[in-house]
Amino acid sequence: MSGLSPEQRRKSIGEIMFYMRNYSVPSLIMIFFAFAFIGWVWEVCLHLVMDGEFVNRGVLAGPWLPIYGCGALLALTLLKTLREKPWLEFLASIFMSGIVEYGTSLYLEWTHDGQRWWDYTGYFLNINGRICAEGLLVFGLGCMGIVYFIGPVLDSIFRRVKLKILTPICVVLIVLFSVDMIHSHDYPNTGKGITDYAVTGEEAPGGISQGMP
């Protein structure tokens, strides 16, 4: 922004941070993969710090946790009407995150012979070990950061990329992700630090990092 007047600089920042924007399909696709990757990095780092070892978190083989990407897209699109009311946005984000996480837990158990990739048993206000108050609070706060800051910034960045460049990137990512989904349906990612959580009243290893697939 060098060379811009203070007024032009404020206007440019305002455009970047405008959270009532409409997101294009290519931007939404890129945002999905961005947050799927960020979620994977988040959980890997938590496990690395708390347990001292690298673990490829999640059901899939690749460096992405799609539930984070889905949560980001739902927050940016379904909750737009609440954008001017942050407290309602926050509460709705918590409710939405609970539905997504609980539903994902049921789906994974149903499609993988009862196998669980996380268990919140023993956490405060947990429901069947699938969701808990602590996790939902974290995800609700995360959604607020996404809709009011990170999402608009990422969208502003992606809008600067020409469609003839952005479109092939989206296609390649979708193809790789689809292949991973198909492969992981029959050969899911399991093992130490992934599915070896506590199933009684004890906390899962890695704490809240066990909360997302």
Predicted regions and their residues:
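Aromatic-rich, lipid-facing transmembrane alpha helices and their immediate juxtamembrane interface loops
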Residues: 1-213
